[in-house]
Amino acid sequence: MGESIMEQVEAIIAPVITEQGLELVDVEYVKEGAHWYLRIYIDKEGGVDIDDCTNVSHLVSEVLDKHDPIAQAYMLEVSSPGLERPLKKDEDFERFTGKLVRVLTKEAYQGYKEFTGYLVGLIEDDIVLEYEKEKMAIPRAIVDKANLTFEF
């Protein structure tokens, strides 16, 4: 056993999403008020549209009903990751090199828990950002979240 609900869900739905020519960006399972929500974020080159989200919602719903990894009732939501999409996989950090990102850490690092800068990339086990011509390497092990940041 040992797998978390999220790991089970990702393993079940990733092939379905990939078969549609889409990327599984993130999965969230959260309780808001009295209701549980399973949120699936998908993307593709050029972005996703409502038809992509509707199609994935139907396909994912079928496969999750078949495997039933979540015991309680939940609402399924499928959407684009938005402008401030999360960066999780190595490929995300490669793809968005040069973009403005925000990194939150689980613990203070060099006196801070929040960093914003242009993504230089991954170097070994560090996320490297550049801010005001200074480079900073943040250990990936202490990163809580990394997201693209919208530039005005």
Curated annotation (Swiss-Prot):
GO terms for cellular component: cytosol. It is found in: Cytoplasm. GO terms for biological process: ribosomal small subunit assembly; translation. It holds the Pfam family DUF150_C. Keywords: Cytoplasm, Ribosome biogenesis. Required for maturation of 30S ribosomal subunits. Belongs to the RimP family. This is Ribosome maturation factor RimP.
